[in-house]
């Protein structure tokens, strides 16, 4: 299922927009059967990095 918040990200997106898109993507991913939080987070961060071109080291 497409995530409009993730789809809207680009190189001009702000940190709060990026964080919201990542959270939304993780939430959607976790609804899938057999989903694991670590895998969903990795997927979401990877998508956000690709869309924004930013390193995204939140929480480190």
Please provide the spans of the model-predicted regions.
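C-terminal alpha-helical interaction appendages
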Residues: 1-60
